[in-house]
Amino acid sequence: MGTVIEVEATAMLVDPNQGQLKVTGVMEEEEFGRQGRTMRRRSQARSSVDNVLTVLKTSLGLRPQDYDIHINFPGGIPVDGPSAGISMVTAVASALTNRPVANHVAMTGEVTIHGLVKGVGGIVPKVRAAAEAGITKVLVPEENWQEIFQTLEGIEVIPVRTISDVMENALLQVTEQVPVPITARHHSTLLGASPKISSGIIP
């Protein structure tokens, strides 16, 4: 079963290099089994936030360190796994550049520190959830592309390889230069494979 989750981001301009980051709605730790033992580690969703900040600076040329940034996953569904990577980048980039996210687009995918989009689990349930929610365009990692996606009606599934591909398909162009406001609120739509946490995917 899949689900559609909104990702919110706000950005408030502060003194240079004095920005702070807050993330809410994600699990701080996760449990996983290995060789008959149950172990705990920092959640992959929380860890992927570090990748997001790096990509914003190195791949998109932005300065998140100059803003107080708040990323939130509303709705009471605890988020875990790396699949929220490109959604978080998109939401924050939207807030920093004042370019709105297209409201008919949803996405899923892990992002590396080099701005590459990596494959995730549960891709078919995620795409189906998007279609059922009325989404007309879905961005998926190129590694997850399947021929069956070409047969779906009413929804376009686009494979993406880099975070630049994501920005091109997710952010709307503005007709004139608009200064970034002191506080900007933007959101993107994340696809989850299940409303419950299961190891390794975002569920």
Where are these regions (language model features)?
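Peripheral, non-AAA+ core regions of ATP-driven protein-machinery
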Residues: T3-P203
